[in-house]
Amino acid sequence: PYPRNVFSCGQAKQGVSLFHTNFTNRIDKTSYILNYGQTPLVKSRYLKYVTKEKHPYGENAIVAIMCYSGYNVEDAVIINRASLERGLFRTTYFNMYEAHEEKQNIGNAKVDTVFMDIMRNNVIGLKPDYDYSHLDKKTGLIKENTYVNTKTVVIGKATRSIIEKDVYIDASKTTKKGQIGYVDKAF
């Protein structure tokens, strides 16, 4: 049934593991990577043909079921803090930002949206309190290995004003709210 397939695909997209061995060379919209994946302790016979038993996925967590301090804790999980601090279940979230240059005809006027150096004098409408300093002067893209937060512009883009031909209006792309990290690739 169709709704069940959609639900199943949605659940699979949320799975955290090493979904592909060339994830560093791929550009996916979003991906979750388990940093310290392990090969499973219990394996199926089919696994040795598919992955040669070298493809890590999941974590081998040791679980003990018992009463804690005399009370029955049925709906709780107690995890060792030292294990978490050493990296148990640590994941990396990759997110892609994309933009396009466009040429549009609006009435008799041609409107161009282009990647550019936003810090030029003829660009108006800059976003207040946003950091444009990490953008490349030639391409308008953020430089690789740059730390980004919610106030960082990742793609410098501007639209030519219809009224004044030499004036551009800022249309830059920023990170989503709450996302912090480092730029992996920019092209």
Regions flagged by a language model, labelled:
Residues 1-187:
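Conduit-forming functional cores of very large proteins
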